[in-house]
Amino acid sequence: MAGALALAVALPLGVQTIGGGAIANAAFDPNAEDFWVDSDMGGIKNRVWRAHDGNTSRVVYLLDGLRARDDLNGWEIETNVGPFLASQNINVVMPVGGESSFYSDWISTSNFNGQETKYSWESFLTQNLPNALANRYGFQSWNNGIIGISMGGSAALTLAAYHPQQFNYAGSLSGYLNISAPGMREAIRVAMLDAGRYNVDAMWGPPWNPAWLRNDPFVFANKLRDNNTRLWVSAGSGVPAPGDPSRHSLTDVVNTGSGSALEVLSVANSRAFQVKLAAIGAHNVTYNFQPRGVHSWRYWEPQIHDLAPDLSATIG
């Protein structure tokens, strides 16, 4: 039953994907800087907003969702959180690209879509990028924050767990934090096929490969507790709120229905993660579960405003 539910959720991802949204608010911000960094994947574009007070010690990385584009990060396309956080005296870094990557170091290139270069996003985000930011801007490479939506939410917790000196704050907004739950691995497989025809076996191997467990926040929750990582975990209920496009066209109906299903899966994962943290005595976390909300940018942008004081008090 759970597996069937997860697959049912994953199948419509071509309409509204994990990390997808329907409402664009910002698009290109001329006040941000392009910053290209060399890596094993080639040159990677990043967008940088400087803190208004000029400090170099307070830095946050914002991670995209499954359909991350190669021109701009979804956070810039769909929201205004870059300039907002900069106004709160936080330096903002948005890596660009990484479709279906889970921001992980992959085992191999994906053979389904002719991928030429193996993803090595974990290495990039924890080695190439912080070193380059330190050299170019003088940014501090420890006690940073990392926040992501959906796919990026899972990755944010993973990166914080295994790189605690770099990231002492991690936020998951509608993330998938229990990927060993029944049906989740199948759902991820289908979603990645839909978003770029990626073979999930190239990422973490077959379902029995230990790499799946290494990247499951539910499994490595004790690392976050032991590191005393400050966490922010949020999700909606899957119930649409006034203002969600649901009646104007068939596309609106399908998008909102898919967004509802995705958010139901996310909140179930996030609630299970909450139970796990409580069971192991991990309390350095804020949960922000909303009574309404689907898998959409219009809900993630307000979360950044909500968590900004907590982030500001922790990083640097």
What are these regions (language model features)?
Residues 2-3, 14-316:
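Non-catalytic cap/lid and distal C-terminal segments of serine-dependent acyl enzymes
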Residues 5-11:
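Hydrophobic helical h-region of N-terminal Sec-dependent signal peptides
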